[in-house]
């Protein structure tokens, strides 16, 4: 067992190495994504390694499938780990429940050095201590009773088969450390806490032991984690000292809060990544939003790509202020990134395929002309609606149903707008049959204004209202000229002719 503690493990890793260590007690949410993202961009900027380590030592709270889902969501977000339970790597296994022998060996080493001791206090005694402290309006803490057991007393209790845990001896006089975000810090943990449990009775470690042992043996050079662990860092540094190991550099990330300053609640259900993926949000939009609301960059800027986040990230610019998240802005972030996807030919091809599937899914039980599923038509829809939609699925909403199925509009509906339905219809049919190399919105707008002048009494706004209803069945939407360009001359003629013959 002692061989498992050889320090060559820590020395074997070279270069910058960071880790994201989620607990699979739930699924990946925006707070976790932000921690993972800062680790990822820091590693990629420095040509380092991004490690995913599943911290599943609290077995009673592990949610089935959560560990796999977390790794899936990192891939979906575009920030996949270089080493992980799924990908493997030179410092595996990357799941703490599979590393129990290592933690037991580490606790034995501390026991041998006198830096830790076995505690035989029962849960009942610990509960009495807690209640007594609360009754006296004090913070509950362990009274370190078993720290003073003699070797003989320990041997007698072991011989009796009593349950025990391993506690770490907290020492006074901790050394200050320089946090990458919060600057110089130290917390005299021995003055406010009892000796902490590092190995439980079931053989599983607590976070304090597991994270120190794993960060050392996995060669982690920088630990970027949530600010809730800042006050525990002095305790972890005492553990490093007891082992005789060099600690990594620490940087604690400020909290991600709701825009009103309240805590993000996992119970809300609306901060989990799977929900955003199912609703059609682009991962780039989420990455952009959670960095835009915080710090780490020279200036706030919407629309950053992952490559830009990597190149522009400055760890020294992370502030201690909490980041306020305004989820109401997410559709705008998504609109910007969706526009960029549409403009990029390679990314646009993927959107075309996704939109074709959406149309078949939403309108498959209706009479859909096969031509509307053709690549050229779908691509034109995307290019013309670029900048006007926040989600791809917007294009299969009721407002855009006219793009995929022919509306049911009667002559009577149009006559309520203008009595010149036949005249206007014939003028438009004549315009559509006129030869033209390319129909453009600008040219059609000019032609439609010219047509209106040929009517007897129909105003331009009324003519547009009539044509919009005839072509789309809608009273609002894109300009009539855009509708006509999108549908094409043949489809426009078909829809106008259908109304005239009804």
Swiss-Prot record:
Residues binding ATP: 29, 228, 263-267
GO biological process, one term: glutamyl-tRNA aminoacylation
InterPro entries: aa-tRNA-synth_I_cd-bd, aa-tRNA-synth_I_codon-bd_sub2, aa-tRNA-synth_I_CS, aa_tRNA-synth_I_cd-bd_sf, Glu-tRNA-ligase_bac/mito, Glu/Gln-tRNA-synth, Glu/Gln-tRNA-synth_Ib_cat-dom, GluQ/Sye
A Pfam family per the record: Anticodon_2
GO molecular function, one term: ATP binding
EC number in record: 6.1.1.24, 6.1.1.17
GO CC terms of this entry: mitochondrial matrix; mitochondrion
Record keywords, A-Z: Aminoacyl-tRNA synthetase, ATP-binding, Ligase, Mitochondrion, Nucleotide-binding, Protein biosynthesis, RNA-binding, Transit peptide
Transit peptide extent on chain: 1-20
Binding site for L-glutamate: 19-21, 55, 207-211, 225
PROSITE patterns (alphabetical): AA_TRNA_LIGASE_I
Locus of motif 'HIGH' region: 24-32
Subcellular location: Mitochondrion matrix
Ranges spanned by the short sequence motif 'KMSKS' region, renumbered to the chain: 263-267
Catalytic reaction equation(s): tRNA(Glx) + L-glutamate + ATP = L-glutamyl-tRNA(Glx) + AMP + diphosphate; tRNA(Glu) + L-glutamate + ATP = L-glutamyl-tRNA(Glu) + AMP + diphosphate; tRNA(Gln) + L-glutamate + ATP = L-glutamyl-tRNA(Gln) + AMP + diphosphate
NCBIfam families reported in the protein's UniProt record: gltX_bact
Role summary: Non-discriminating glutamyl-tRNA synthetase that catalyzes aminoacylation of both mitochondrial tRNA(Glu) and tRNA(Gln) and participates in RNA aminoacylation for mitochondrial protein translation. Attachs glutamate to tRNA(Glu) or tRNA(Gln) in a two-step reaction: glutamate is first activated by ATP to form Glu-AMP and then transferred to the acceptor end of tRNA(Glu) or tRNA(Gln).
Family: Belongs to the class-I aminoacyl-tRNA synthetase family. Glutamate--tRNA ligase type 1 subfamily.
Name this protein carries in UniProt: Nondiscriminating glutamyl-tRNA synthetase EARS2, mitochondrial
Protein source organism: Gallus gallus (Chicken)
């Amino acid at each position: 067992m002692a061989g498992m503690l050889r320090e060559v493990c820590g020395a074997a890793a070279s270069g910058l190495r960071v880790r994201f260590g989620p607990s699979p007690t739930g699924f990946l949410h925006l707070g976790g994504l932000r921690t993972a993202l800062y680790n990822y961009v820091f590693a990629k900027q420095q040509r380092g390694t991004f490690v995913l380590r599943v911290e599943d030592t609290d077995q009673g709270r592990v949610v089935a499938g959560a560990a796999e889902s977390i790794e899936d969501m990192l891939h979906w977000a575009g920030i996949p780990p270089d080493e992980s339970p799924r990908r493997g790597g030179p410092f595996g296994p990357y799941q703490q429940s599979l590393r129990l022998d290592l933690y037991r060996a580490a606790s034995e080493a501390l026991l041998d050095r006198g830096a830790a001791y076995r505690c035989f206090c029962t849960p009942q005694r610990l509960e009495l201590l807690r209640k007594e402290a609360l009754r006296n309006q004090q913070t509950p803490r362990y009274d370190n009773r078993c720290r003073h057991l003699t070797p003989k007393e320990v041997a007698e209790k072991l011989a009796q088969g009593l349950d025990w845990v391993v506690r770490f001896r907290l020492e006074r006089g901790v050394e200050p450390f320089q946090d990458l975000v919060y600057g110089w810090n130290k917390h005299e943990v021995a003055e406010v806490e009892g000796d902490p449990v590092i190995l439980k009775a079931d053989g599983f470690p607590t976070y304090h032991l597991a994270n120190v042992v794993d960060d050392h043996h996995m060669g982690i050079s920088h630990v970027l984690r949530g600010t809730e662990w800042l006050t525990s860092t002095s305790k972890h540094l005492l553990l490093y000292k007891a082992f005789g190991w060099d600690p990594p550099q620490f940087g604690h990330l400020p909290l991600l809060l709701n825009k009103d300053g309240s805590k993000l609640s996992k119970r809300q259900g609306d901060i989990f990544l799977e929900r955003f993926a199912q609703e059609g949000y682009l991962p780039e939009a989420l990455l952009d939003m959670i960095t835009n609301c915080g710090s780490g960059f020279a200036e706030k800027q919407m629309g950053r790509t992952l490559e830009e986040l990597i190149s522009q990230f400055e760890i020294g610019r992370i502030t201690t202020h909490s980041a306020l998240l305004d989820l109401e802005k997410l559709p705008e972030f998504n609109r910007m990134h969706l526009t960029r996807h549409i403009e990029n030919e390679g990314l646009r091809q993927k959107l075309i395929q996704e939109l074709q599937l959406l149309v078949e899914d939403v309108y498959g039980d209706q009479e859909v002309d096969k031509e509307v599923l053709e690549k050229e038509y779908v691509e034109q829809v995307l290019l013309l609606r670029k900048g006007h939609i926040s989600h791809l699925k917007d294009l299969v909403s009721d407002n855009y149903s006219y793009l995929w199925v022919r509306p049911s509009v009667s002559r009577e509906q149009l006559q309520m707008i203008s009595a010149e339905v036949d005249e206007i219809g014939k003028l438009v049919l004549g315009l559509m049959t006129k030869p033209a190399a390319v129909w453009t919105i600008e040219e059609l707008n000019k032609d439609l204004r010219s047509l209106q002048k040929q009517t007897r009494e129909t105003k331009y706004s009324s003519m547009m209202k009539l044509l919009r209803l005839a072509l789309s069945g809608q009273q609002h939407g894109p300009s009539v000229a855009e509708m006509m360009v999108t549908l094409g001359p043949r489809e426009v003629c078909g829809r106008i002719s259908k109304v005239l013959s009804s």
